[in-house]
């Protein structure tokens, strides 16, 4: 049987101790045995695993002996030499072949020193291992704690990301609603422009008809003037005829008077017929003028209604623009909230980076410790081989040195008591630390996996944040410019309203028109810039969406997302082309509007000129009507006189002397009657024409009456407006100064906008470069993911190896327990041998005493 010294083995409870031999009260039970109070048995481990772990622990403890105890080898060599020289076994007791007591004491003393050194080396290794365990447990604990914090922060970040996604979706819905409203407004404006075009055509036709009617009225006025001149001549002729009649009554006889009276009567009849025809023509023309005036009034009413509708629509559009501005303000506030959230996220990211750096340091320490362990394992394997050789030599020496060790054990036991007390405390601390380290190690491995994933995500986020900061700076500049442009647009709209009210005087001022044209051009440029900015914002938002989707689906669907990205880029390009086409259409529509407005201005000027001419015609017509009434009164007086003359002529016809003349006159009268009938037929035709003209004139007179009423109202309004215009002129002069200042500012802004456009072009190029970089980064990320997966597989393999090692440790522990039991049995045998040795010594002493007596 091979014997191995175990100074820390307990005594057997059932074996009686020798009366002369000291017991081992200071030796506690082995810490790896199941009876140890501080090391509970693992519930999931079998006996084989415990035995294997105990065996491995013993091997690790014994591996340090050859390095730390060089004296052991020397002692073994000395004993070999003694064995060779003596050539006898230790059990012989003859005087010639046995060793001297001094040599035996020296050998036992050397053997005890070697054992002490071995014990010290074992204690030292145990302390080193306990320190390493405590360090590992602390590192695991800190890493697990950091991982828990990182998980909580990651959850917070995920919840915030979900909130931001929801918020972005709401913003997109609001933007889509705004765009739909804008589209509806644009359609409504297009319909209004079409209606304006139709009205402008109607106005143009009406102006043409008005011009024709004016020409006809001018011709009629000329005819009326001729008729009036003829009437005046006829009246003069009538007066002269009356005078002649009066003279003829005095001078000429009755027959001559009758002939002249007949002649005058015929002339009067012809003149009266002409006057009636002219009166009927005048009535017809008056009716036509009335009808035309009525049409003009109706058209003006329609125009006013359309203008009211247009104003209402403009008010609606303004309300919509105000709503859009409110929505934009809300969007800005929400973006500010997002900025604040992102700043918080950045701070948290910085904290995470600091924690990650600490974890990396811990990982480096762990790697160093693993290297040290590997080196120690190699050394242990080499030392095991050496120790096996030395054990065989030491076992032979142990038989000889057991007698001498007993005397020295008493001194060692006192020291061992102190050592065991310290070791018990150390074991208790080690158990606590080991449990903590195990938990920390498990958490450390989990954290490392998560941290590596997060590192890649954070790197991508940092780049995205840098890009977002640049974009936001640009957006802030654009928003400031838009605010300035909105302020300018409001001022311009106020000026436009005043200009629309001041149409009569602003038309005379050509400079203001030039200013308006400049403002319109500037507005077009501003709108184009706004549209470009909105397109860019949409592009950025779409890119942000794409980045968020890439972050979420990076591990599972990156290839699908890349395909979608390409498709979306093609769609965006198509949308940009559509937007450019829409912009061109809008520009063409605006040019058409400007042309239509110029036509409207011209038509309104013509209408006003026509109104002035109509007023002059109305005044002339009134004067003519008064003259006609006077003529009618004169004609009535003449008819009464002619009636009296006819009565006198009838009395004269009775005169026989006048019968022949009367017959001749009758023949003439018949001829005249035929002529008169022909004239009457012509007159009837003229009367029908005149009636038609009178109906037209009546309609025109009705229109003119309505127009006069409106004109009176308009004149009153115009007087009020003139007062307002005077006040407004002063304001306009002040505004002109402001406008000039604004024009200078706008020119500066245009220059700034051109610079910005150049910068935007550069930024677009940079964005393209960044997209290429992002693609490269994605490829790198994929490679990194592959590496991470490989590392994860390695880690899993290492974990499996660790589990296998733990099982082996348990098996070694069980083996150690079995070996300890065997050692106890060996100790019992050693004690029995010691008792026999004591008996032999007693016998030897008795023999020596007898020898001395002899």
Curated annotation (Swiss-Prot):
Please note every region of biased composition (Basic and acidic residues). Answer: 45-66, 100-114
Report biased composition (Basic residues) as residue ranges.
15-35
Q: Which residues form a coiled coil?
A: 103-854
Chain intervals with Polar residues compositional bias: 67-77, 85-97
Answer whether the UniProt record assigns the keyword Coiled coil to this protein.
Answer: yes
| NAD as UniProt keyword | no
Superkingdom, natural source: Eukaryota
Q: Which family does it belong to?
A: Belongs to the GOLGA6 family.
The entry's protein name is: Golgin subfamily A member 6-like protein 22
Query: What organism does this protein naturally occur in?
Result: Homo sapiens
Per the record, the gene is: GOLGA6L22
């Amino acid at each position: 049987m091979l014997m191995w010294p175990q100074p820390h083995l307990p005594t057997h409870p059932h074996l009686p101790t020798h009366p002369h031999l000291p017991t081992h009260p200071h030796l506690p039970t082995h810490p790896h045995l199941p009876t140890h109070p501080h090391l509970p048995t693992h519930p999931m481990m079998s006996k084989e695993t415990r035995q294997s772990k105990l065996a491995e622990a013993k091997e690790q403890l014994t591996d340090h002996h050859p390095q730390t105890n060089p004296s052991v080898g020397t002692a073994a060599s000395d004993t070999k030499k003694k064995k060779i020289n003596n050539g006898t076994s230790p059990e012989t007791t003859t005087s010639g072949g046995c060793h001297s007591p001094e040599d035996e004491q020296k050998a036992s003393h050397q053997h005890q020193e070697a054992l002490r050194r071995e014990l010290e080396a074992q204690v030292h290794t145990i302390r080193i291992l306990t320190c390493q365990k405590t360090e590992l447990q602390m590192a695991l604990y800190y890493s697990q704690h950091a991982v828990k914090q990182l998980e909580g922060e990651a959850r917070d970040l995920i919840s915030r990301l979900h909130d931001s996604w929801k918020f972005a979706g709401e913003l997109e819905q609001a933007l889509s609603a705004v765009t739909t409203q804008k589209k509806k407004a644009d359609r409504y404006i297009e319909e209004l422009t079409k209606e304006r075009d139709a009205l402008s055509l109607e106005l143009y036709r009406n102006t043409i008809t008005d011009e024709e009617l004016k020409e006809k009225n001018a011709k009629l006025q000329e005819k009326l003037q001729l008729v009036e001149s003829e009437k005046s001549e006829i009246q003069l002729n009538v007066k002269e005829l009356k005078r002649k009649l009066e003279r003829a009554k005095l001078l000429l006889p009755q027959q001559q008077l009758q002939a002249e009276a007949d002649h005058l009567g015929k002339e009067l009849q012809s003149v009266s017929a002409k006057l009636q025809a002219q009166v009927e023509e005048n009535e017809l023309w008056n009716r036509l003028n009335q009808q035309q005036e009525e049409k003009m009034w109706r058209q003006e009413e329609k125009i006013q209604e359309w203008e009211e509708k247009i104003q209402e629509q403009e008010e609606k559009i303004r309300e919509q623009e105000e709503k859009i501005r409110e929505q934009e303000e809300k969007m800005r506030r929400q973006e500010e909230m997002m900025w604040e959230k992102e700043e918080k996220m950045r701070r948290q990211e910085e904290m995470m980076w600091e924690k990650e750096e600490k974890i990396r340091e811990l990982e480096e320490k762990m790697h160093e410790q693993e290297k040290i362990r590997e080196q120690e394992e190699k050394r242990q394997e080499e030392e095991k081989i050496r120790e096996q050789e030395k054990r065989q030599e030491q076992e032979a020496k142990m038989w000889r040195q057991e007698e001498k060790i007993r005397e020295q054990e008493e001194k060692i036991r006192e020291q061992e008591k102190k050592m065991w007390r310290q070791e018990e405390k150390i074991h208790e601390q080690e158990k606590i630390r080991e449990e903590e380290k195990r938990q920390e190690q498990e958490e450390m491995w989990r954290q490392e996996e998560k941290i590596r994933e997060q590192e890649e995500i954070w790197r991508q986020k940092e780049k995205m944040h840098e890009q977002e900061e640049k974009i936001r700076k640009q957006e802030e500049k654009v928003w400031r410019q838009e605010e300035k442009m909105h302020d300018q647009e409001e001022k311009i709209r106020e000026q436009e309203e005043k200009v629309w009210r001041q149409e009569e005087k602003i038309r005379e001022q050509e400079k203001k028109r030039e200013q308006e044209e400049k403002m319109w051009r500037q507005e077009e440029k501003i709108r184009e810039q706004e549209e470009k900015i909105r397109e860019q914002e949409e592009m950025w938002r779409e890119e942000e969406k794409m980045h968020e989707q890439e972050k979420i689906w990076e591990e599972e669907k990156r290839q699908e997302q890349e395909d979608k990205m390409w498709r979306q880029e093609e769609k965006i390009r198509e949308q940009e082309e559509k937007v450019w086409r829409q912009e061109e259409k809008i520009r063409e529509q605006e040019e058409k509007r400007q042309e239509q407005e110029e036509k409207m201005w011209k038509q309104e000027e013509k209408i006003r000129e026509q109104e002035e001419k109509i007023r002059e015609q109305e005044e002339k017509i009134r004067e003519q009507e008064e003259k006609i009434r006077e003529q009618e009164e004169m004609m009535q007086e003449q008819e009464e006189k002619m009636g009296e003359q006819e009565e006198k002529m009838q009395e004269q016809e009775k005169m026989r002397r006048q019968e022949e003349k009367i017959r001749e006159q009758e023949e003439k009268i018949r001829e005249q009657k035929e002529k008169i009938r022909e004239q009457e037929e012509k007159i009837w035709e003229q009367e029908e024409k005149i009636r038609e003209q009178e109906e037209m004139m009546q309609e025109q007179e009705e229109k003119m009456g309505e127009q006069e009423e409106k004109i009176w109202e308009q004149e009153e309004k115009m007087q009020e407006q003139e007062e307002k215009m005077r006040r407004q002129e002063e304001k306009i002069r002040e505004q002109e100064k402001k406008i000039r200042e604004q024009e200078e500012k706008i020119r500066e802004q245009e220059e700034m906008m051109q610079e910005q456009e150049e910068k935007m072009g550069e930024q677009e190029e940079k964005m393209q470069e960044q997209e290429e970089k992002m693609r490269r980064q994605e490829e790198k990320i994929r490679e990194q993911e592959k590496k991470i997966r490989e590392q994860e597989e390695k880690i899993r393999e290492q974990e499996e190896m660790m589990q296998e090692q733990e099982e082996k440790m348990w098996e070694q522990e069980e083996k150690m327990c079995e070996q300890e039991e065997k050692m106890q049995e060996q100790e019992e045998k050693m004690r029995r041998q010691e008792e026999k040795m004591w008996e032999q010594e007693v016998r030897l002493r008795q023999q020596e005493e007898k020898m001395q007596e002899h």
